[in-house]
Amino acid sequence: MHGLLIVFEGVEGSGKTTQLQRCSDWLQANGMGSGLDVFGKHRPVVVTREPGGTSLGLGLRKLLLEGHSSLIQDRTELLLYAADRAQHVEEFLKPQLALGAIILCDRYTDSTIAYQGYGRGLSLHLIQQLNKIATGGLESDLTLWLDLDAETGLKRARQRGTADRIEQADLAFHRRVQQGFAQLAASYPQRIVRIDASKSEQEVHLAIQEIFRQRFSEWFQKLIRPS
């Protein structure tokens, strides 16, 4: 039985974490995660994140987000994210997918391309190779990109309280990150779906629901294919 990996991406303050949780609640309220789907298969709904989706990852998350910016070199940062992902894929994602779970993941490989590639200016080819190594080729079935102007998102994020290490970066960095997400969406239109995150929280949630409805038939045909 095969599960689904659905990723939520976006710049700081785009609302992706809020929307991921609302999506989880909606799926469970509609029978997923607590019963049988339309094909009689049990589909648990699980929520995870990168970095920090495993015990090892929690330590890496603290180092990456709470540490002082000048103490972590860009290539070191890239390798730490790759280490977190490699552990996450083997310890959590693959086992959950084998159980047929619908996984909602807060950030995945596209974030590394956008932040460390476009934002930090590291080699995109190198990042793509590291992503392949870390994931073993595991890609998302769907990535929801919550598209929000970088300046607006950064203001939202900083209003939450003390800015983390990534949020402390200047606006130019976050604009490059936004450009990276836009380029990825243009390059992979079947996998990455753009959501206008400038709309109200409820409007964004309804837009995500509609995307799920459009893809349910395709997804479940995949889920029940022979192993």
Describe each region flagged by the PLM.
Residues 16:
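Conserved lysine of the Walker
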Residues 22-26, 151-227:
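NTP-dependent small-molecule kinase module
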